Each structure stands twice: as C-alpha cells, then as structure tokens.
C-alpha cells in the first residue's frame, strides 16, 4: 500500500506555512535560508544542485552548508495527528479508503509514525499467506482464521502421516493413500472383504480373480440396463404425449432471422453454394422439436432467379407444418410475405422452401437490404405429428418394394 504523510493527516485544518512551496506537501526535515524561508530539506538540496544556488522565494544566494534546520517548525509538524496506515483498505488504487470496520483505530503523531514502533506491533498490518501468495493479503489479526480454511495449508494424512495441501488431502485419501482401508472393487458382486489399499493386488490374486463376483456384477448391470431401458421408453412416451398436447393447443413459434453482413455471406455462398450455406441458429418449438432456416440464392422457378428460404426439420417423426416467411422492407407496407402448409417426412433434415424473386430483393431502391442486413420474419406451427415408429416401418416397407420392382425388371 503506497501512501504519503499528507494522505494520513487526521485533521485537515493545518496552517499553510507548514507546507513546502516547492513540492506542496508537509515539510519533511524543514530547513531555512538565512532570511528564514523554509522548504523540505530534499527540495532545497535539489534546488541548489540542479536549478540555482539561491532561495527560490527571496533569491538570496545559498549553499547546502548555509541552510539551517528549523527545529521549532519541524517539531510542530511532527506533533500533527495522523491515522495509522493500517486504518485503510488494502486496495490497488492510488486513493486510500478508510476501513471503519476492520482497520486500526489508533491515532498517532507524525513522530510516532516515523519511529516505527507502532507499525511493528500493529495487529492490523497486512501480511501475505505464508503458504501461498495466491491467497492474497490479510490483516495480521485475521490470518489465523484464513489459515483454518486455506486450501494450501499443510495437513497431515491420518494414515500415512505425510503432509498434503488441504485441497489435495481428500483426493489422496480417496485414490492414493496406501494405508486407507478400502473394500474390494467387486463388492457389488458379493465380495465384502476390506484391507489396506496397498494389499489390493494381493487380495485379487488370492480370490481366483473374482470370476464369480464379476459374473454377478455383469448380471446386475444387465438387469439394471433392462429396467432403465423400460423407464426410458415410458419417459419418451410421456414426452411425446405432452408435446402432442402442446401442439394440439395451437403450439407455434414466431421469430425473426437477422442476417448481418449479408453481402459478405452472399459472396461466400456464390463461391461454393454447398459449403457456404447461410444457415440460422437452431429453433426449438419444444426441447425435442428442433428446426433450422437456411438461405439459397441459386434457385430458378419458371425461368426466374429466386432466393429460397428453406425450413428444415431436425427430428425424426412425420409432421404436417404450416409456416410463413416475410422478407421485411424498410417500408412495412412493401414487405413480402408467403405461407405454405406441407407434410415433412420422418427423416431428419426433411425440408420445404418458399421462393422470393431475386430481382426484387436485391434492388437497392426497394430497400429490403438495409445497412447490409436482411431480416426475415417467420412463423412455424406444427399441425400434427404421425407416430414415429409407424412412419419408419411404412418407409422401410416402401423402400423394400422399390428394390424388388427394380430387380424384377
């Protein structure tokens, strides 16, 4: 903590004559010229050695040898009251902040502060943790409380008697200590023996490799897996039932897709339409019903170049979905909105699109692209979901029929 005597002054009503006219601080070891003008000893010496050998106040010629100590003035200064430096918070700022709750309450004279006796005995001095500097600094009267909780405090293992940092002792006992009493790793299979950790290998060798216990554990895991699978199936069924109820209650999603730096995205897309697709962040209607939007600029419909806004379904069940896209214009009355209702297959990635004429969107006078960003408002509403397993079975059956027909031909 950095401070000057001026920072610690208890009373602010101090005679201006006690301040040095060069450094503007309280005079430290005041000395005077033959005419009686006083400055700090250090300031007067610096004036003579680096500026000019004269008093900066009356301009009388002086040398270091002709300067006189002003004992009376210095005694008056030394009797001024100051705070103990440990009255303040230990902060990294240049400004001292009085710590009224935990700081030292002692008021000293400047002379008492300079002789250092109080500072050597003060219980409010800041000290570093002796076990690790990362802990920071604490007042001397609080350091014991810190050490009772310090993660780096050396703690002796009850079993092996070695010292460990407090934060590492638990792991030592749990994983490493050779003298800790442990149970057999095949306890779940029926082996209830206990022994010091360092005898584990010996125990395993004497028990015919614990084959029967291992078999018991495997059987237990298989039984648990079967039970867990049954519970998971029930949870999935409940989840699907809840989602169906949500959808039947007009569950839908409204949002906006803002494509910033649109021109840069579009240039990358033109370089490689397959790897540089413009794709939205994921959209979740429910925790398991995910969608995404993407933009394609190379679609041709009836000989007209179009921008396609594509809705992709990222979950595995057939769905009938009503969706709309609105490419917004700076003038709301000129925004273009289109709507579709489509059936999406059970496959993940099943998609449908809506097209918008490129010439209208890219015409700068039409003001669809403003500040190099394109905004697309969208609405997605799931109207119905077909049973997932039924849809997959129907799909597999149709696929097998197609293969058979091709083989017959």
Curated annotation (Swiss-Prot):
The UniProt record lists the keyword Zinc: yes
The answer, when asked if Membrane is one of the entry's keywords, is: no
Q: Where in the cell is it found?
A: Cytoplasm
Task: Give the ZnF (TRAF-type) ranges.
Answer: 75-145, 145-201
**Principal subcellular localisation of the protein:** cytoplasm
Q: Which Pfam families match?
A: zf-TRAF
Q: Where are the zinc fingers (RING-type)?
A: 20-59
Q: Which residues form a coiled coil?
A: 221-250
Query: Which residue ranges does the record assign to the MATH domain?
Result: 252-380
Q: Which domain of life is it from?
A: Eukaryota
GO MF terms here are: zinc ion binding
**What GO cellular component entries does it have?**
cytoplasm
Q: Which PROSITE patterns match?
A: ZF_RING_2, ZF_TRAF
Please provide the record's keywords in A-Z order.
Coiled coil, Cytoplasm, Metal-binding, Repeat, Zinc, Zinc-finger
In the record's own words, the domains note is: The MATH/TRAF domain binds to receptor cytoplasmic domains.
Summarizing the function annotation, the protein's role is: Probable adapter protein and signal transducer that links members of the tumor necrosis factor receptor family to different signaling pathways by association with the receptor cytoplasmic domain and kinases.
Sequence similarity: Belongs to the TNF receptor-associated factor family. A subfamily.
Q: Tell me the protein's name.
A: TNF receptor-associated factor family protein DDB_G0273435/DDB_G0273505
Species of origin reads: Dictyostelium discoideum
